[in-house]
């Protein structure tokens, strides 16, 4: 009986340790950030606000909204760089990794918007041009936080339109 009691105590301690280990690892399993400031433009509060906006924009749409700042991409084509970044960092929502990513390389002054998975359907070339037409002048003026927020807001509007109308926002149905 004494041996059984000791064995049960050891088993209980082992289970408690396992549960604790799983609980401690949960933050590491949290979703990856949607606003990725590799350049270091934004202070902590701004980054938190932008992240909350991007999460809200993507919520319920199975399409993540990413805003990425980097220093320089050298001579690499910005579209190739952004697509490689997207794939290499396992970005996107769901099995088809749906999303949209706006990247600006501040050192080289290059930018691009790419879509992936369901983001390709939700964001037409027409709509991407509209978004860039709003965002890029703000970037040129150095209004980086406003540019990021505008991008996130326009992506949210686009995803909402797609969800409500069953078709993407395009030149023939733009309100």
Task: Label every PLM stretch briefly.
Residues 2-175:
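A structural boundary signal for the start of the first folded domain, especially the loop/turn
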